[in-house]
Design a protein with these regions (language model features):
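Outer membrane beta-barrel strand-and-loop segments of large Gram-negative receptors
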Residues: 1-45, 71
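A short, polar/proline- and glycine-enriched secondary-structure boundary/capping micro-motif
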Residues: 2-3, 54, 137-139
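Extracytoplasmic loops and strand-loop junctions of Gram-negative outer membrane beta-barrel proteins
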Residues: 9-16, 55-60, 95-98, 144-148
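A general structural-boundary detector
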Residues: 17-19, 31, 63, 102, ...
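Long, well-ordered mid-to-C-terminal structural blocks that present hydrophobic/aromatic surfaces
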Residues: 32, 42-63
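Beta-strand elements of well-folded, non-transmembrane domains
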Residues: 34-38, 50, 80, 94
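Conserved C-terminal beta-signal and adjacent last beta-strands/turns
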Residues: 65-185
Length: 185
């Protein structure tokens, strides 16, 4: 796993991929679908994780860290109209505080929305979307561990986009001869 170390010998930050002595994760997941007639379809997914990492030869600062964290994701699709085929999708995601080596990873989350228009007998789809509406999806990890003191600030970006998909259809899988395995006998 890649992690950062501030050298005690000179003013330098060292990013290096290391194998930890020990890493263990235990988790549980629940997924709850929910539907109201044909106009609302939703799914809530909850995940809980216990995470343990240990490294006795991590430079001059061995660590043994444990953290419980949770993840929640919700997907919602609203059918605004069937003729024309118009759907609104709103998704949300949140991740509580976690660890990675000596890093502390802060809480993060995002909300995305998309408006989907299907036409041409279901062969064409026009999709307008906005990802990370509130600009909260990017984390700024930090280290406050023994002699290490680092704060990273990363920017979040809202993304707008348009996509178009057309299904040409008519694909039929070719019939193929079976593999000759007689030589393996």
């Amino acid at each position: 796993m890649q992690t950062l170390y501030q050298s005690s010998q000179r003013l330098v930050e060292i990013y290096k991929y290391l194998n930890f002595d020990y890493q263990q994760k235990f988790g549980i997941q629940a997924s709850v679908p929910f539907k109201i007639k044909n106009w609302f379809n939703s799914r809530l997914t909850l995940i809980g994780i216990w995470h343990h990492e240990k490294d006795n030869d991590f430079w001059d600062i061995p660590f043994n860290r444990k953290q419980c964290y949770g993840i929640a994701q919700m997907n919602n699709t609203f059918t605004l109209s069937t003729r024309p085929d118009l759907k609104l999708t709103v998704t949300g995601f949140v991740h509580s505080k976690a660890i990675q080596g000596i890093y502390d990873l802060p809480t993060s989350g995002n909300v995305n929305a998309a408006l989907r228009y299907g036409f041409a007998k279901g062969k064409a789809i026009l999709n307008l979307y906005c990802n990370d509406i509130f600009e909260t999806g990017q984390i700024s990890p930090r280290i406050r561990f023994q002699t290490q003191n680092v704060t990273n600030h990363y920017s979040c970006f809202r993304e707008f986009g348009v996509s178009f998909t057309y299904k040409f259809g008519g694909y039929k899988e070719k019939q193929r001869e079976g593999v000759d395995t007689s030589r393996f006998k």
